[in-house]
């Protein structure tokens, strides 16, 4: 599986914890019918919705967030915004992030889904909010909405 490849390509001293939320029937179907999921065990998955507080707790405990997007999806998922907004580095399979104004290759790594090679320097850097990311803040979004409403005559 992709996560097995990620774990294999990381040095032993980098601790990983994967939290994967999928429906239970999908796990069983992929694990036993398609023989996917590699060495990942049932304990690596959660089959219940993860609360906002739990997501925030896991994000706070993390140095880097891994985003594995659906290859048929267009655009970004919420995870890049959550990661970067919380001052975390990001590793993603979604190359469309490179087109965003806030893209910074020092704190955002785009990896190949088939051969995920990760530059471990990403685990050593400390980040704050990055240039261009302010555009996606709640405050800026609110200003845009009210400007649209006021200009809607």
Give the role of each language-model region.
Residues 108-115:
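Conserved acidic donor-binding segment of nucleotide-sugar-dependent glycosyltransferases
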Residues 86, 104-106:
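Short, structured coil segments at secondary-structure junctions
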Residues 1-77, 92-103, 140-152:
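Nucleotide-sugar donor-binding catalytic core of glycosyltransferases
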Residues 60-62, 84-87:
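Conserved donor-binding/catalytic loop of nucleotide-activated donor transferases
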Residues 115-153:
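A charged, aromatic-enriched C-terminal amphipathic alpha-helix characteristic of glycosyltransferases
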């Amino acid at each position: 599986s992709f996560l097995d490849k990620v774990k294999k390509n990381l040095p032993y001293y980098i601790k990983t914890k994967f939290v994967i939320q999928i429906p239970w029937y999908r796990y069983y179907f992929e694990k036993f019918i398609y023989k996917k999921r590699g060495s990942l065990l049932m304990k690596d998955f959660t089959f219940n919705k993860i609360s906002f507080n739990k997501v925030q707790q896991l994000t706070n405990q993390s140095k880097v967030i891994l985003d594995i997007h659906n290859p048929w999806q267009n655009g970004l998922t919420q995870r890049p915004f959550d990661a970067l907004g919380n001052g975390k580095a990001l590793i993603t399979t979604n190359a469309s992030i490179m087109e965003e104004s806030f893209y910074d290759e020092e704190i955002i790594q785009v990896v190949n889904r088939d051969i995920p090679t990760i530059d471990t320097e990403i685990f050593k850097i400390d980040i704050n909010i990055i240039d261009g990311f302010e555009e996606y803040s709640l405050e800026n979004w609110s200003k845009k909405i009210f400007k649209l409403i006021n200009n809607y005559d």
